[in-house]
Amino acid sequence: MMQTKKPDWLRIRIKANQSVEEVIKLLKDLSLHTVCQEAQCPNIFECFSKKTATFLILGDVCTRNCTFCDVKKGKPQEVDKNEPKKIAEAVKVLNLSYVVVTSVTRDDLEDGGAEHFANVIEKIKELNPQTKVEVLIPDFNGDEKAIYKVVSARPDVLSHNVETVPRLYPTVRSKADYERSLSVLKVAKKMDNRIYTKSGLMVGLGETKEEVKEVLKNLRSVGCDFVTIGQYLSPSKQHYPVIEYIHPNVFEEYKEYAISIGFKHVMSAPLVRSSYLAEETTKII
């Protein structure tokens, strides 16, 4: 049964300040996109006020049509060859010690944009040698050569989200494949076990507790180090509906379970998103 009324624990107070305005202006001046803005993240004001952002590369138009996602779909733009330099400059201006880079899925590109990811990582590290870099990558259609391009650039954390339980893939992620997503994480770890791997999933889409715990076990079986779990919030009535608002106690239960089976870092709460407080992993890496 679909739920429509948000519970109190999902209500957040929006507080804009000078730091938020500075980040927004910088992004606009450099013609950069963030997933914070494109995906209507509920934590955008908190993160921007700390001068942190998750950069969205390869444009803001996705070639896939996942029913949960608010990023634009359609025919993507040409790849901006200057984007790696612009992002590296933004990282320097914002004085970031930890940066997250993600992208839309670009099935129209031969390597899915893997080389561009590598260029961004390398340029950030060239201009900001002390900055830790996390990349949240698409599945590259399982292309191991593409995955290797990203791994070879030596990100500190390589993340790929499974998003939901396998039973719900046909309706939530129809162009994706659960086993392929697990394989991305497995292959990346095998290519370079010095890189930490990470994944994330949303709950409230109609999954069961047992299914969530099975996904966590599957992630650990491929060597995944970090995991995030957050409440799914439907962007509009045209998107996949929220089936259930999960109580904070259940998120705590998932966190305890994930830690018990060996995850090194777990973020599990209603407003958690895959890049939320990602810099906390610096205590580990």
Curated annotation (Swiss-Prot):
Cofactor binding mode and count: Binds 2 [4Fe-4S] clusters per subunit. One cluster is coordinated with 3 cysteines and an exchangeable S-adenosyl-L-methionine.
Protein name: Lipoyl synthase
Domain of life: Bacteria
Binding, [4Fe-4S] cluster 2: 62, 66, 69
Segments crossing the lipid bilayer: none
GO molecular function per UniProt: 4 iron, 4 sulfur cluster binding; lipoate synthase activity; metal ion binding
Lineage summary: Bacteria, Bacillati, Bacillota, Bacillota incertae sedis, Caldicellulosiruptorales
Cofactor: [4Fe-4S] cluster
GO CC entries: cytoplasm
NCBIfam families with a match to the protein in the record: lipA, PRK05481.1, PRK12928.1
Main location: cytoplasm
Binding, [4Fe-4S] cluster 1: 36, 41, 47, 275
Alphabetized SUPFAM superfamilies for the sequence: Radical SAM enzymes
Membership in a protein family: Belongs to the radical SAM superfamily. Lipoyl synthase family.
InterPro entries: Aldolase_TIM, Elp3/MiaA/NifB-like_rSAM, Lipoyl_synth, rSAM
Cited SMART domains: Elp3
Catalytic activity: [[Fe-S] cluster scaffold protein carrying a second [4Fe-4S](2+) cluster] + N(6)-octanoyl-L-lysyl-[protein] + 2 oxidized [2Fe-2S]-[ferredoxin] + 2 S-adenosyl-L-methionine + 4 H(+) = [[Fe-S] cluster scaffold protein] + N(6)-[(R)-dihydrolipoyl]-L-lysyl-[protein] + 4 Fe(3+) + 2 hydrogen sulfide + 2 5'-deoxyadenosine + 2 L-methionine + 2 reduced [2Fe-2S]-[ferredoxin]
Originating organism: Caldicellulosiruptor saccharolyticus (strain ATCC 43494 / DSM 8903 / Tp8T 6331)
